[in-house]
C-alpha cells in the first residue's frame, strides 16, 4: 500500500483533528492518480479554513464523536466539495452530514437534499407521500441544525428533475448505495443523479465495503456491504467513469462478515457484541466518479 499525507495549510492544519490522508489501496484495484493528489492539495489551500470552521462549529459538538471514523474533512476534500458549489446530498437520513454541509455551503453555496423517486421506491401511496413530506421539510430541518434561514436550503425527489438538470457541481451518496441496491431502484436513481450533474460535475460515494471474495448473497446490499469492484462496474454501466479511489474511510479491523450485517458494527451495535465495540465503524470504500463522455 502506498500512502500520501497532505498536510493542511496554515490555520486549517491546527483546526482540524487530523491531516488529510489519501491512500491508494492496491488490494482493491484502484487508487488516486497524481493529478488528483495535486488538485486535492490545492483545494485544501483554498478552502481548508472554511471547511475547518464548518467541522468545528459548536452545533456539531455531538456529531464530532464520529469524526475520527468518518473523516469528513478528508472525505469532502477528496471529493473537492467547495463552499461555493451546488451540492446534492442523497438520502440525507439522520442529518449527520447535513449539519456539516449546511454550515459549509450555507454562506455562498447551495445544499439540496435528494430524495428517492417515490413512485419507484414504493407502491404504497402513504409511503410515497412520506418521502415527499421529508423532502418538503428538509430546508427547515437544516435551518434548525444551523441557525441559517431555511430559504438557503432545498430538496427534490428524483421524479422531479425539471429545472434542475445539469445544475449540480457535486452529488454525495454517503452510506446509502446498499439501500437502493436491495430495493432494486439503484439504476434509475443513479441515472437521475447523472442528469442533475453539470458536464464537469462529480459524484462521490462512501459505502460499506465487502471483501472481494464475499458471496453475492452477502454483498448484494442486504447486509449493508457491497464489493468495491461491483460498485465501480455498476457506475460504469450507468454512464460514469472512476476518477479516483481513497482509503481514507478504510478500516481493516472490520471483518465485514457479520451474520446480521453492517449494523452489528458501531455505532448501531444491533447485536451488542462486546468484541465489536472497540473496532470503530465499518470498512468503507471512498470513490469519486465523473460523467462518461
For the regions a protein language model found, what residue spans apply to each?
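Class I SAM-dependent methyltransferase Rossmann-like catalytic core
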Residues: 49-78, 82
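Conserved class I S-adenosyl-L-methionine
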Residues: 83-93
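A short glycine-rich, Lys/Arg-flanked "PGG" loop and its adjoining helix->strand segment in the class I
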Residues: 102-103, 186-199
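S-adenosyl-L-methionine
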Residues: 126-160
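A short, conserved alpha-helix within the catalytic core of class I
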Residues: 158, 179-192
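A short acidic, Gly/Pro-enriched loop at the edge of an enzyme's catalytic core
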Residues: 161-171
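Conserved beta-strand signature within the Rossmann-like core of class I S-adenosyl-L-methionine
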Residues: 200-208
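Core SAM-dependent methyltransferase catalytic element
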Residues: 255-293
Amino acid at each position: 500500500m502506498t500512502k500520501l499525507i497532505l498536510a493542511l495549510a496554515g490555520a486549517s492544519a491546527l483546526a482540524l483533528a487530523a491531516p488529510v490522508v489519501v491512500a491508494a489501496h492496491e488490494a482493491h484495484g484502484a487508487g488516486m492518480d497524481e493529478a488528483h493528489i495535486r488538485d486535492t492539495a490545492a483545494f485544501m489551500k483554498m478552502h481548508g479554513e472554511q471547511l475547518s470552521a464548518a467541522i468545528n462549529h459548536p452545533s456539531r459538538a455531538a456529531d464530532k464523536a464520529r469524526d475520527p471514523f468518518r473523516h469528513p474533512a478528508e472525505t469532502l476534500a477528496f471529493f473537492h466539495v467547495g463552499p461555493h458549489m451546488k451540492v446534492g446530498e442523497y438520502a440525507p437520513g439522520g442529518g449527520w452530514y447535513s449539519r456539516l454541509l449546511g454550515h459549509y455551503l450555507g454562506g455562498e453555496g447551495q445544499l439540496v437534499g435528494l430524495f428517492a423517486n417515490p413512485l419507484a421506491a414504493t407502491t404504497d401511496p402513504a409511503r410515497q407521500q412520506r418521502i415527499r413530506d421529508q423532502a418538503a421539510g428538509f430546508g427547515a430541518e437544516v435551518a434548525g441544525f444551523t441557525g441559517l434561514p431555511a430559504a438557503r436550503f432545498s430538496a427534490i425527489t428524483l421524479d422531479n428533475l425539471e429545472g434542475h438538470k445539469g445544475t449540480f457541481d457535486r452529488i454525495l451518496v454517503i452510506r446509502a448505495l446498499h439501500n437502493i441496491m436491495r430495493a432494486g431502484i439503484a439504476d434509475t436513481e443513479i441515472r437521475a443523479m447523472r442528469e442533475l450533474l453539470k458536464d464537469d460535475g462529480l459524484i462521490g460515494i462512501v459505502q460499506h465495503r465487502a471483501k472481494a471474495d464475499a458471496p453475492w448473497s452477502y454483498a448484494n446490499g442486504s447486509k449493508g456491504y457491497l464489493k468495491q469492484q461491483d460498485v465501480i462496474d455498476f457506475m460504469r454501466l450507468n454512464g460514469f467513469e472512476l476518477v479516483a479511489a481513497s482509503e481514507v474511510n478504510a478500516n481493516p479491523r472490520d471483518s465485514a462478515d457479520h451474520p446480521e450485517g453492517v449494523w452489528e458494527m458501531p455505532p448501531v451495535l444491533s447485536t451488542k457484541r462486546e468484541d465489536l465495540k472497540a473496532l470503530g465503524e465499518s470498512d468503507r470504500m471512498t470513490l469519486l466518479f465523473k460523467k462518461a463522455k
